């Protein structure tokens, strides 16, 4: 019942903001008058159930201060800014009051009969009120038959001489005397409480027994004939001797839970002049039925042998926040019923196989926040009842010592890899380690009966690719957040890591730098209900990326620009806050869906905002209108069509260029054929003029066969009627018996053009070079470009420049080069024909003005 009232009070303390009740007002049941500068109790309705008057300036409370409030259950008068005077029967008009809170108010005067008439008062709070011993000695609490909780902490009480009326408070279960100045408590002081069973009794932070000399023979047992469920004597600065004497003094009293936290027992680290608890320290508690012993927040350095030997009923032992560095052999001997052992926040560096002997029923061992780096193999193997082992935040580099137990906590260590051991567990917590290879994940997913696997804040970024997934029918929750899975998956390996997890219900992949999701990576997760992908770099999410039965998706803090709403229609809850939405018409479909969907959108609307364009930056998507985007869609279609037309045209153009370039010879032949067919361009001779030949072909006799096949058969009329040129060349047209130079000169001057076929043989033939020189001479004489030079073969510029006669021509005139690709021969012959047919400009005629002799006058 008391727990329910505590919960009720907590609700009341938040009544203003929760129920929307404005300050200094009431709604018929709750009167909310905190911080209202009141100097007296306000008048409220008789239906009021809770009256909150804290943080005001009320000075006096008398019997007439309150109207008759039969339904009032909670009165809060604490934390007044002025000293408070409470007169006789000040609360008699509140007959059904259950909780009276006067805490943190400086009580200037409290009448001994102030609380008379509160027959139903359940809890009385008088903490930090400046009260003295008189409140206990003078019967202030008599007749409070329903009183269960009495809080007198943080006052100025120095002794616990209780008024005999305490013996009649049969409902009293909890008394708090903590943070007073009670230096000594003896048997006769608490005599009115003898025979009672108290759920809580606190003497914490009083410097009890530590500032005075105690004659334990006279003081005797302060809790004689009492049963205490929780006895709190923490924070009193007890040494080993004081603790031992106190244990002996209360040896015949029942104290199920003994809190001795914040003590000064133990040598600490580096000191030897203060004793650690030994075999005699807790010997007096042998018959006290202690089940829970709290020795946390002290300086114990060494757990000595059999230090807890007499505590046969102990089930929970809390040794956290000490300086324990050494556990002696048989330190836990005698703790046959211990179930929970807390050794967290100590200085343990290594554990040995003998450390936990004597704990046959221990189910939970907490060793977190030590410095453990080495653990012997058999340390936990013999603990047959062990259910949970907590080794978080140590310095472990291997786990070969881990037994098969349901819950294993190993986060915050230095694990880089895991040994291949036979392991069975329900929960494995391995976050904040240094695991890198996904082979470790494959191994852990094979652990039988595993239900929860936590691997957050590791370094998973590589994959060997030689692992195969195996069926795990038990795993329900997998935490892989804050790793680097993008680096592993971008190698196209380990995409099958989730294949065997047909019963997985919750998967966390947040903070993994994911740019995209591997195809089908979730396709086998048929039972998945919740998926977290928040704080990644996803820009696109397609329907095939998500499991079919997914209900809850967290994809917040990604880089989604314009998501497709069809991806989310099957969800129940969606968190899409803090993405980088581009608020243009492409987003209109998603905005419309967002405003009309039945899917629960997590997070405040202000967190779903635009980042572009700048005019909409920071604007919530729920505030945007999509009007005008229909015309934009039409324009978009038009733009797309225009894009397609331009793309096709450009593609055809490029393909045409590529085809013509690749098959240019064939294309040229087709062009010439079409020209003849369309324009009836039949071969015909050249126009008659003053020249006997159209061209003189000058070449080396060693090249005759090639010249005949390559040129003469395609150009010379005597080789074919289809040809149009009357050519001159040495082998046919030179007059036998005549001087060779004369033949050359005659051929040069009787031909419209001179075509020199310069090959390697040409450069070695003196007559050819001589003919080239004569041809240059004609060009100089006629001031025209009758000489056509054709380079045949792979002759370099340097080879041509070595010959003086050719050097001058190459430096000043253009020349042709016989094509290397056979398909270019037709085009080349056409170009050569055009050069032969090309007429030179007529030379200007002289005016033929005769010169006359000019007479000189002397």
UniProtKB/Swiss-Prot annotation:
TIR domain residues: 691-836
Positions annotated with a glycan in the UniProt record: 37, 46, 245, 342, 422, 595, 598
Source organism superkingdom: Eukaryota
An example Gene Ontology biological process: positive regulation of nitric oxide biosynthetic process
S-S bonds: 583-610, 585-629
Transmembrane intervals: 640-660
Protein name according to UniProt: Toll-like receptor 5
